[in-house]
Curated annotation (Swiss-Prot):
Catalytic activity from the UniProt record: UTP + L-glutamine + ATP + H2O = CTP + L-glutamate + ADP + phosphate + 2 H(+); L-glutamine + H2O = L-glutamate + NH4(+); UTP + NH4(+) + ATP = CTP + ADP + phosphate + 2 H(+)
Pfam family, one: GATase
Catalytic activity, EC: 6.3.4.2
Protein name: CTP synthase
Extra facts: CTPSs have evolved a hybrid strategy for distinguishing between UTP and CTP. The overlapping regions of the product feedback inhibitory and substrate sites recognize a common feature in both compounds, the triphosphate moiety. To differentiate isosteric substrate and product pyrimidine rings, an additional pocket far from the expected kinase/ligase catalytic site, specifically recognizes the cytosine and ribose portions of the product inhibitor.
Pathway entry: Pyrimidine metabolism; CTP biosynthesis via de novo pathway; CTP from UDP: step 2/2
Described function: Catalyzes the ATP-dependent amination of UTP to CTP with either L-glutamine or ammonia as the source of nitrogen. Regulates intracellular CTP levels through interactions with the four ribonucleotide triphosphates.
Active site: 382, 508, 510
Binding site for Mg(2+): 71, 141
Designated gene of the protein: pyrG
Residues of the Glutamine amidotransferase type-1 domain: 292-535
Keyword Ribonucleoprotein carried by entry: no
Naturally occurring in which organism (per UniProt): Natranaerobius thermophilus (strain ATCC BAA-1301 / DSM 18059 / JW/NM-WN-LF)
Length: 537
């Protein structure tokens, strides 16, 4: 029978509940347990797919094509498991399902209510995650903070589970903030006390409190929190800020968090094996080189919009003993001022990630052009690929006015065009080409050299694609098609033949990168950027 750990948050949002949940998952997995992690988001959207990155940050895409919260990226990277749509549930999905059942008459004339129908639906998704993943332990993070009206049905559902399956199968962990007041020079426990009081008023007694803090908690503070939160002193966990998120599992392990969980849930687990993780963290702390990557996007004021990209760069950097410094370049400002020399001064590589809409598109095209002309290692992702193709078609292949029909429907040369199967699609939500699809690699190319495989599976999120009507003309002028769908219908990767390293992909390689196992394309890109850095010194 599966065990369930519920992670709630209090005092403030953005405390790192997702990192805490992912770190606990890593520790339990290293004890030999099969772990899966869920995120419950209390917003009414079905998923974050149509939300602005400024509102939500990155949309993380799973293998099965779910558009999910960015925390799922953290979960996958920490526990090294592919998750699916059952691992991210929103209020919108829950109500949609319940209302659909009501219309079908599945409630047999009953009045449909939050309790039991909404709460039962929530619980069914938790049990389904356990079943689908054959999990020994399910960790479920409840989004938002305790006290938010939107979270109440989720909190009630997880409260009920203690009665449904027994106290020994359910554990509650509350993540809070212990703020430091500069004026008085002391840490304040009152916000955490009130947050736990609010949680207890809803019928949930936390078994452990993880305290985010800038300063170490004294024994006196821990004892005070234990007294007012009604938990053991050793269950008051200090979660200090760290330089790198991959240090968190070790920090929790030093306080026996995994041991406390194993004891509380009577887990039949093995001894903890954390040596490889410690080696990774030691490696991260002692990187001897540094490179700079210019990341050109229009959401750069909210860096969480590109969190998987920056993590993938870091993973590759670890592999080459290099810290990867990101120089954030606003594509809209670049388009307006045109100062490419200033923008890319000191960069060792240029990366243009995905995005939507025509705002700032000119700046991204300028970035691809600058990398092409100056032999700077370049990685284009999704829209980044489109921009590199547009630049090449216009500047090299002589197709003046070439563009994407997404932005210029009247372009005489739509080198990027809508996928045929998308032409009758009207709804925006969940209707793109989503999830993992196979890609056939062409031997003798940069892509094949990076992967060393004939067929790879990569995750997609797009409606527009390379237009094969211009394939022959572009390849005759030096564009290399290095990856295609198995039926040769879709172009997945393009390169430049007379360039040290210029690769652009239709898919999103960043979603499959892991610490200790960097994605092959990011690995090769960072390697070339490092060579570029060393040769310029």
């Amino acid at each position: 029978m599966s065990k369930y750990i519920f992670v709630t948050g209090g005092v403030a949002s953005s405390l790192g509940k997702g990192i805490s949940a992912a770190s606990i998952g890593r520790l339990l997995k290293n004890r030999g347990l099969n772990v899966t992690i869920q995120k419950f988001d209390p917003y009414i959207n079905i998923d974050p797919g149509t939300m602005s990155p400024y509102q939500h940050g990155e949309v993380f895409v799973t293998e099965d094509g779910a558009e999910t919260d960015l925390d799922l990226g953290h979960y996958e990277r920490f526990i090294d498991e592919n998750l699916s749509r059952i691992n991210n549930i929103t209020t919108g999905k829950i109500y949609w399902s319940v209302l659909s059942k009501e219309r079908k008459g599945e409630y047999l004339g009953k009045t449909v209510q939050v309790i039991p129908h909404i709460t039962d639906e929530i619980k069914s998704r938790i049990y389904q995650a356990s079943k689908d993943n054959d999990a020994d332990v399910v960790i479920a993070e409840i989004g938002g903070t305790v006290g938010d009206i939107e979270s109440l049905p989720f909190l009630e559902a997880i409260r009920q589970m203690r009665s449904d399956i027994g106290r020994d199968s359910v554990m509650y962990i509350h993540v809070t903030l212990v703020p430091y007041l500069e004026k008085s020079g002391e840490l304040k426990t009152k916000p955490t006390q009130h947050s736990v009081k609010e949680l207890r008023s809803l019928g949930i007694q936390p078994d452990m409190v993880i305290c985010r803090t800038h300063y170490e908690l004294s024994q006196e503070i821990k004892e005070k929190l234990a007294l007012f939160c009604d938990i053991d002193v050793n269950a008051v966990i200090e979660n200090l800020d760290v330089e790198n998120i991959y240090e968190v599992p070790m920090a929790l392990n030093e306080q026996r968090v995994d041991g406390l969980i194993a004891d509380r849930l009577n887990l039949n687990s093995g001894s903890l094996e954390l040596e490889r993780w410690k080696q990774l963290v030691d490696q991260i702390k002692n990187l001897s080189q540094e490179i700079t990557i210019g990341l050109v996007g229009k959401y750069v004021s909210l860096q969480d919009a590109y969190i998987s990209v920056t993590e993938a760069l870091d993973h590759a950097g670890f592999n080459y003993d290099s810290k990867v410094k990101v120089k954030w370049i606003n594509s809209e400002e670049l388009e307006k001022n045109g100062s490419v020399e200033t923008a890319f001064q000191g960069v060792d590589g240029i990366l243009v990630p995905g995005g939507f809409g025509d705002r700032g598109i000119g700046g991204k095209i300028m970035a691809a052009q600058y990398a092409r002309k100056n032999n700077i290692p370049f990685l284009g992702i999704c829209l980044g690929m489109h921009c590199s193709v547009i630049d090449f078609a216009h500047e090299v292949a002589g197709l003046n006015g070439a563009y994407s029909s997404e932005f210029h429907p009247e372009t005489p040369y739509p080198v990027i065009d809508l996928l045929p199967e998308q032409k009758e699609v009207k709804d925006l939500g969940g209707t793109m080409r989503l999830g993992a699809y196979p890609c056939k690699l062409i031997e003798g190319t940069r892509a094949y050299e990076a992967y060393q495989q004939d067929i790879v599976q990569e995750r997609h999120r797009h409606r527009y694609e390379f237009n094969n009507d211009y394939k022959e003309q572009l390849t005759n002028n030096g564009l290399v098609v290095s990856g295609v769908s198995p039926d040769d219908r879709l172009v997945e990767i393009v390169e430049l033949e007379d360039h040290p390293w210029f690769v652009a992909t239709q898919f999103h390689p960043e979603f499959k990168s892991r610490p200790g196992a960097p994605h092959p394309l990011f690995n090769s890109f960072v390697q070339q950027a490092l060579k570029n850095s060393l040769s310029s010194k």
